[in-house]
Amino acid sequence: MKMKAMLSQPTNGKTEEEIATTRERAIATLESMGYEVVNTLLTDEWYSPDSCEARGVVNRPMMFLAKSLENMSLCHVAYFCKGWKNARGCRIEHAVAEAYGLTILYEEGDE
């Protein structure tokens, strides 16, 4: 069985290009280490503001965090991208990863 990893990546205030570049670099790093990366970037229509509102979601950031934690349950490793300490969701993901014994990796220079 291939070990699975997830990314914890700050996105607030970043352009789509910045997010994609960081994400691609992190995925390449994890794949070169032999991990299968579980997608935690939720971009399809189901997660759009209108769709969430229609379903009664009143706190989208919390919904994204909940889905991320669900995906984390599939993983052995959590990889934290630079700037994670400044992002509320990433800090929560880090605390959960520590509490539940996931292996924690950091983007170079950001422990």
Where do the language-model regions lie?
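Conserved catalytic or regulatory cores that recognize and/or transform ribose-phosphate-containing ligands
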Residues: M1-E111
